[in-house]
Amino acid sequence: MGVCFSAIRVTGASSSRRSSQTKSKAAPTPIDTKASTKRRTGSIPCGKRTDFGYSKDFHDHYTIGKLLGHGQFGYTYVAIHRPNGDRVAVKRLDKSKMVLPIAVEDVKREVQILIALSGHENVVQFHNAFEDDDYVYIVMELCEGGELLDRILSKKGNRYSEKDAAVVVRQMLKVAGECHLHGLVHRDMKPENFLFKSAQLDSPLKATDFGLSDFIKPGKRFHDIVGSAYYVAPEVLKRRSGPESDVWSIGVITYILLCGRRPFWDRTEDGIFKEVLRNKPDFSRKPWATISDSAKDFVKKLLVKDPRARLTAAQALSHAWVREGGNATDIPVDISVLNNLRQFVRYSRLKQFALRALASTLDEAEISDLRDQFDAIDVDKNGVISLEEMRQALAKDLPWKLKDSRVAEILEAIDSNTDGLVDFTEFVAAALHVHQLEEHDSEKWQLRSRAAFEKFDLDKDGYITPEELRMHTGLRGSIDPLLDEADIDRDGKISLHEFRRLLRTASISSQRAPSPAGHRNLR
């Protein structure tokens, strides 16, 4: 149901996630294979039969004025708040056009999303929802600065300076990070869906269109193809997408901001999809030679085709290029870090030891994003994470509801020196993104993983023997269960290849991460 609430122009407006959105001047028709094929099943539309539970006194509070734009189910207007004269945007949705239950669900979901994100500085502010016998009214902040797309096109060469681009990208990443903490994936990040609050050059950017957005349960994936062709991530086309797809889209936008061209282009949508799946962005053409290495590194790490190796929104906010001029307090807790902390307790003892060894080989520059995450969780800034701070951090990943006993179990697994606290070294071992380390710098991965291996391989013969494993871990009793997990060829010892495989893959006991008990079904 997303509508761009611009007092200048409305592009890509749509009242239904199941319908095509209006074409924009710089993008092909957004795709949505969820389009319903059901026939109308009754003389009274579902919308007319539904009480949405919203207030019934819209006209007592607002006077509708100038038309801004329209979608499939209704129109968007400027309206005046009667008590104080404030100008707002009102989307008026026609109940008679909500024929099927899915259309009603879409309206309710959009309101739910706007309420969930209410208060975020880079999301259009939700004021209220009303209804009467004929319409649903969604009242929001009015943005009068125009679309991000229009500002791009107004720039010389259709591109931003690096400094200005970083400011814009930082705001989009903050929106994505906030969405992901709420168990929400935007699914249609593109310049047309961001508006400026005002025409001022330093106006804040606002995300306005959540028409394709959806809640997702932890560990689950979307299996449909939605979004806009130029910005769609490879995993969306493979029908296995999640929050990572939003970061890919922001990577595409960043590429456009910096050079004025799309990274993946063809004359047809099928051609675009093939480009997305097969090719890498071109950094050899003008003006990339004049763009900083830091900016190029940032874009490349967002446009990694493997979603496991792609930066998360929170990690991207820690990157030197986008962080310059920003504050550490802008960086939200990273859902992938929280997931890694939850998973660490499920890993075998051997994998926990291996990850600790790998973490000890990394320098500060390689784990700067994890330093930001540690500092965000360490509320009292005493250099360690307490049980209460761990509980507060894990609670920020809203779809999960962990019992205190489970939080204590997680902290105990991470706390290798058993002092009841998690220091930074222990935190890195549990929070590390191994796939990213391998993808972003394969040579460094080879060196780091070998160095970790050699912490076990005391005689440097190229294998970890049972006795070396026992000496490193300090474990008593049979070492066979640990050895068996990594010893793929069953020769009674662990090679470097087998050790790297252990680092890359979750242990056998944790390959199926369960959805949290008591997960709130937000749909």
From Swiss-Prot:
Regulation of protein activity: Activated by calcium. Autophosphorylation plays an important role in the regulation of the kinase activity.
Keyword Glycoprotein in annotation: no
Enzyme Commission number: 2.7.11.1
Residues that hold Ca(2+) 1 according to the record: 378, 380, 382, 389
Segments for region (Autoinhibitory domain): 328-358
Positions with a binding annotation for Ca(2+) 2: 415, 417, 419, 426
Signal peptide coordinates: none
Family from the record: Belongs to the protein kinase superfamily. Ser/Thr protein kinase family. CDPK subfamily.
Annotated stretches, region: Disordered: 15-43
Lipid moiety-binding region (S-palmitoyl cysteine): 4
Cited SMART domains: EFh (SM00054), S_TKc (SM00220)
Entry membrane topology: Lipid-anchor
GO biological process: defense response; negative regulation of defense response to bacterium; protein phosphorylation; regulation of secondary shoot formation
Residues with lipidation of kind N-myristoyl glycine: 2
Subunit annotation: Interacts with BIK1.
KO phenotype (gene knockout): Severe growth defect in shoot elongation. Severe growth defect of flowering stem.
Top-level EC class as recorded in UniProt: transferase
Organism: Arabidopsis thaliana (Mouse-ear cress)
Record-annotated disulphide pairs: none
Binding residues for Ca(2+) 4: 487, 489, 491, 493, 498
Subcellular location: Cell membrane
Active site (catalytic residues): 188 (proton acceptor)
Residues that coordinate or bind ATP: 68-76, 91
Location of Phosphoserine modifications: 228, 318, 495, 515
Top-rank taxon: Eukaryota
The protein's name: Calcium-dependent protein kinase 28
Pfam families (alphabetical): EF-hand_7, Pkinase
